[in-house]
Structure formats: C-alpha cells, structure tokens
C-alpha cells in the first residue's frame, strides 16, 4: 500500500465514524495538535469530530536528508473526537485493520506517555502505540487546553504518517517510501528537506528572527484587544515556529528558552479564554438541542 492510498484509507475510515475531513491549516506549526481544528475545537462543550493531515515542522530535527527517519518536516494524520467515544481504542484498532494490520497477528502495545505542550498550556493522559516495537501513534485524552479544563474530554489520535508507511511498506529509510506509483518520498521532499535543514542550522538571520518574534507577539496581543481570536492565534503559531528556528540555531539560552515558552503560553491562554467566551455568547451553537437537532 503506497502512502497516498494509506492516507485515503484513513480518511475513508474516519469519515465512516462521522468525522469531517479537513485540509491542513496553512500556518507553520510543530504538530497537528497546534492546528485550530484541535486546539480551539477542544475548548468548551460543543461536539467535534474531525480528521486531517498536518505537515509538521520541527527545525531542530532536520538532518539534511541524511537520516533515515528524522526530518525537518514530517506529516501527521490527526483525528479528534469530542466527546471521546467509549470505544475509541477499538475504533483505532479498526483503522489499523483497514490498513491490513490485524491486531491479533501483531504485537500492539499502549505504552503510558502522558502528554504536555507547555507552549500552549495543554496537558492530557496519553499513550504511545507501539506496533511490533515501532511507535506509530500518539493517543491522548485532553485534560487541559490553553489553561482551561476540558469538558467534555477530547480524544486525539495522532498517526505518524511516515512511520506507519515505513512499517506497511517495510522500508528502513523514509525517502524510499512510495508516495504513489512511480513517485517516491525522495522525489517530492528531499530537496526541501536538505535546504530547510541548511536554513535552520546555517543561514537563517537570527537578528531578523528575534525581531519577528517580538513583532508577531505584539500583533497577536493587538488582535486580542480587538477580540479577534483566529488572527491572534495565527500569530501565536508564527511565534512558536520562529522560536523553534531560533532554538535550532542554538541562540536561545536555557533561561531564555523558558521565557519564550512562557510568552507564547500567556498568549495561548488569553486566546483560549476569549474563544470560550465568544462561543458562550453565541450559546454554544453546535451543542445539540433536545431531539438531536443543532442550533443553526
């Protein structure tokens, strides 16, 4: 099964579980969790079921395309369900079966790994899912997002697209993966991986990045004063990515690192609170009324 077919299979499966299929969010981020489709939608009582592929940029993990499984940019297939179904684990195992992985024939383990994202003020109970000794998925029940307690609880399933495809295709090097017939992962991503690694470690203008962080932070705060959650959150994402670029260059000290993370977290918490209040003023329109109908 090539990677393109694998993604389509996951999309079809989770669509059958009433998840809407979204496109990736167009601002740089380090993980699918940071998309507003997860971060903001996990806030408040409104139900939400969605899936999407999210390119995830982690500058410090770049290896110029020379490492078989560490990348500047990888992909995650993200599934979020609120409230979390009682049978979410069974649903997940069912998705593996659709990919040709019979849970009865493989060693599948849920290894406790509680999750935290200090930049966004998020935390939850979590497990890594190991398939025959390889981690392929992160499974999380959100307890807190943006400093707010989650009720109802949102479940998040994050498939590592490249890792899962490597297992299915029995490839040791991610660049050897077949994306679709006749086209490899290397054909599509190798040049970008090399150049982005060189940028992250060698050529980025750190003075400019320091200025950009401050500029993005001010703009996020300014948009919050206007009550504009989504524009403000876009700039928080830009702050996060800019910080990651600075961190990759090694120009941020241990003390400064904590300070930068704190600045991002403070903005994220303000945004979470404002988003909750804005939905509350609307009467939480996606909450079902008695009889199963939604507010329109």
UniProtKB/Swiss-Prot annotation:
It catalyses: tRNA(Gly) + glycine + ATP = glycyl-tRNA(Gly) + AMP + diphosphate. Its EC number is 6.1.1.14. It is found in: Cytoplasm. It comes from the Bacteria. The keyword Ligase applies. PROSITE patterns: AA_TRNA_LIGASE_II_GLYAB (PS50861). The keyword Signal does not apply. Gene3D superfamilies: Bira Bifunctional Protein, Domain 2 (3.30.930.10), Class II aaRS and biotin synthetases, domain 2 (1.20.58.180). Keywords: Aminoacyl-tRNA synthetase, ATP-binding, Cytoplasm, Ligase, Nucleotide-binding, Protein biosynthesis. InterPro entries: aa-tRNA-synth_II/BPL/LPL, Gly-tRNA-synth_heterodimer, Gly-tRNA_ligase_asu. GO terms for molecular function: ATP binding; catalytic activity, acting on a protein; glycine-tRNA ligase activity; transferase activity. GO terms for biological process: glycyl-tRNA aminoacylation. GO terms for cellular component: cytosol. Belongs to the class-II aminoacyl-tRNA synthetase family. PANTHER family: GLYCINE--TRNA LIGASE, CHLOROPLASTIC_MITOCHONDRIAL 2, GLYCYL-TRNA SYNTHETASE. Tetramer of two alpha and two beta subunits. This is Glycine--tRNA ligase alpha subunit. It comes from Listeria innocua serovar 6a (strain ATCC BAA-680 / CLIP 11262). The gene is glyQ.
